[in-house]
């Protein structure tokens, strides 16, 4: 779908004009490193490189399998989030679980995950094409090295789990601290299986077997959903850290059950890899393998990952300290990392569903244009890609702003999460969604640099952006009452992307001889204006249906009426404002529906 829309835009609109005073650059000698198009960022589930390959055989069938798998993964992930909130809530136990659950992924990304995504996967694809044995020896060495490294890292992480909690949650104390340490020891066992899953997925993608990597997370989600429901049926709602210490079997169920989901996911992927013909034969003869040279080329990407992990460390510390302080003051609504994470998961959904698809379609196009010395076409791709993403992300972000609180009450206010807790999540989400456009712009700009073969610039840009994020985040902790800190914590988070996007815009403006800024800004303004009548209708519907009984029916009725009516108003207003991106998208959608 994104490829079709991009092609339609390319046919229907003129090429982007260079900014005033600049000439179009078409230098055949300006060749980038096409291989860097496969270097993925840090977003969850964002495996950009995988879909850039053309699968043999029935491409339509393969694409359909991947699309359905992706949708099922998102849907089951959404359900998992809802069930998890019902099981652990947003109070002290929820904060303990969230911090402990973040530790294995942070450790993995910092020590191995970044290298795997940015270096070893492109290196493996290259060796499979060039080596006489089809890259078999390289794969055997890589698997052996990775599994040994993962085993050692997992073992050490279990031993030092307490230090991870001290680092990431310095504000925890008493039973909350003890529960966090126990959960961390259970959950860091996932590190080995997270790495095995990532490696198996990469090797399957290199073999053009895309189905299993798309479907395996569904199994993980289903296991965790089952574990959370089981935990809720045994422990009941409103469990506290003290309750968990008194019932260690319930704590073991929560921790080991979560880890089991990752184990099952890894097992599915390893089985799929074996079915594809891979047989592991341990090899440690690394001399001459090229792995060291490949890893050495990742220095700038690793710098970016280190800065990103530093940002996660700052946000986690601020949120956990604020949540613990608010609880000490007797504040009953969740004000820590759990509420922040539940809002963040919803915030990233539009980007994960819409913008990631556009990025996947853009990367090979931009890389081809770089290789052909057509930076003017790279500029056109970026402009069209951002405007295409904005056509859906702008109205969705405004809808999320309007319906954030009733929607969060509808999905989260059950089990261990009270209506007041859910309302707090909704208010955090309202602050988050204001940052959705800068977040999307930053991610697209970063992929332009990767298509240009430049990992250095995004890494360097991340440093001042992270300084701004850390400074403002700690300022919130110092100056605000603890129960309000997490509400405004998305502002420092968004500031990182605002500053990063501004800096990268200026740098890309020079690299690409303009960025079609006037047209892009005009489209953004028109799109936001087109959402005003829809937003007013949405707010009106919230007030109209407020009198219905319960928490679910008022929210559901307001969202159905306001969403349907708002969508119609948005399209009509966009037509009046002559937003051609919206009309082109709708025409393409009509054409595809007629074909079916």
What residues fall within each predicted segment?
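Membrane-embedded alpha-helical bundles of multi-pass transporters/translocases
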Residues: 1-596
